[in-house]
Amino acid sequence: MAIVVNKPLPEFEANATGGIKVSNVSHLGQILILYFYPKDNTPGCTTEAMQFRDKFKDFEKAGAVVFGVSRDNMKSHDDFKAKLELPFELIADTEEKMCHMFGVVKNKIMYGKKVKGIERSTFLVGPDGLLAQEWRGLKVPGHVDEVLKSVKALKSGKKLAPAKEAADKPAKETPVQEAA
């Protein structure tokens, strides 16, 4: 089942650092931010994590809970979290269940070879459990500030405009299809 803005998230459950279990209903009543990134300890992903870290108190003040999601294992996440002193948890989606559910697994060309990669994307879920906004294929600079702005608007009851990155960027990569 695909995720759709203004609809509830499909059922899921995942493990995060700190022994936390995250599901489609675990954070009802709170604003939930799920940001998907390709890999721990890579330049863009490190910058993005530090930007979420640096704005964490602002997100918390606005009633939002932040989770980073990647295919890395729990040990990699624990090390990455400790190294960057991240105040939020990281979800280890080693089997790519969430990545496929959210449609962030894409075919990419690296060094002339076709590989499966994660498209940097963020999903904002309202306190009612409905997907409020999504950003796909985003660029790191300025993104965290845009998410925070949307969180504050959502908290105040304002209608959210479509995300710039999602609306303005044509899809260049195709989703990877799972075998039946």
Q: Where is each model-derived feature located?
A:
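Chalcogenol-based redox active-site neighborhoods
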Residues: 1-180
